[in-house]
Amino acid sequence: MKLYLVPTPIGNLEDITLRALRILREEVDVILAEDTRTSGNLLRHYSISKPMSAFHINNEHKVVTSLAERIVAGERMALVTDAGTPGISDPGFLLVRECLRLGAEVECLPGATAFVPALVNSGLSADHFIFEGFLPHKKGRQTKINEISKNHYTTILYESPFRLVKTLQQLAEVCGNERRVSVARELTKIYEENVRGTLEEVINHFSQKEVKGEIVIVLEGIEKE
């Protein structure tokens, strides 16, 4: 019958919408979750009790067709991820595509996505930007970094805390130490941190501490000649 894409908080549990709570409580038969333990804890916090099924990067290719067929046959499902909006650097695209192919209705609720507050809060231009998500770990990584260095638009990246300094150093090698950048860490959480400055300044900041949490990098574009 219908697939709902339901964003969940990226940290602060007050950031879920009233509509999202209503959909999860009243409008669906099954909740598809990236991690049923994580989402289970979230749902219990909001006093929501619904059957759950795992849908993640390791099984989505195997189950996507059967799930879409069940939705077409009349089931109402919601897809949630551990944090943020499904399909944004998280599972979701394959299921949406298959549901649309089979004629099922798909509805996406507006809600939390980490890169939006990171961009708006960066002090860098938000008129035109490119969201790259996570960089490749190996193959194609340097090629992508070289491409990013030539962007005239602001570029947004997700990164793990363990690779943050390395990624900033690689960007500095091709962009120059003076390119401006903003790094948002643990957005909406108690220890939220926003560090803005040149690549050199931000590298120095994070090189002196153990980095933890979810990371968003917002990189200034080069000026058009």
Where are these regions (language model features)?
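Class I SAM-dependent methyltransferase SAM-binding "motif I" and its flanking Rossmann-like core
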Residues: 94-151
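Short active-site oxyanion
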Residues: 24-31, 103-106, 154-155
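A charged, well-structured terminal subsegment
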Residues: 70, 140-156, 174, 218
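Short beta-strand scaffold positions
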Residues: 33-34, 90, 158
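A contiguous loop/helix-start segment that scaffolds small-molecule binding in enzyme catalytic cores
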Residues: 154, 158-225
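Glycine-rich, flexible N-terminal cofactor/catalytic loop recognition
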Residues: 1-57
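Glycine/small-residue-rich loop that forms an oxyanion/phosphate-binding "nest" at active or ligand-binding sites
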Residues: 64-113
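Conserved helicase motor
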Residues: 54-61, 134-136
